[in-house]
């Protein structure tokens, strides 16, 4: 069954980066991406306004909202979902969350036709948020599960013989933990280090077509780490 084209707004604030993307009913794309540590609250709504104005639309034209559900900065994930919920409530529209790890893998496919991507975001506290994604008809699909893990433990549970040579390595985790990067030496370190709302649109639209968008009050973040054990580090979120 064909689905009528939708106008979809996507936003992410889960890392040091802040991004907004808009896909219109005629498949035009408008976007912004910026590094804005600790400025997400001030940047997101004005940027949403700018993107919508560039598209010559209004907020009322938006059919659904896609948000970066995490994992990432605890504060950033909360900011992103809260702003997305506020917009969705006001517009009486549904929302759908997309993994930040999947978004980076999807960008690697879009940029380099990558068939296998290992994504790792620096989770602080000596850990990474990690996942492996593989290409299925142009969509990067999770192989296994997303996890928060110490690099040493990851290397112990993932034999070097099972690593897929030539895979792209995306995210901040590889530069943060050089021993982990060395373990994946038969892979390619990508210049994709932050999730981008632009590359959440494809997965978000697929989920919307599958009727998986939910009311704002049902939208949930994905932290992976138990918030009870979350520790604030000096100068870090």
Predicted segments, located by residue:
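Phosphate-handling active-site elements
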Residues: 55-60, 89-98, 112
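Surface "functional belts" at beta-alpha junctions
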Residues: 3, 27, 39, 94-195, ...
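Short glycine-aspartate micro-motif
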Residues: 8-10, 66, 76, 116-120
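Acyltransferase
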Residues: 188-237
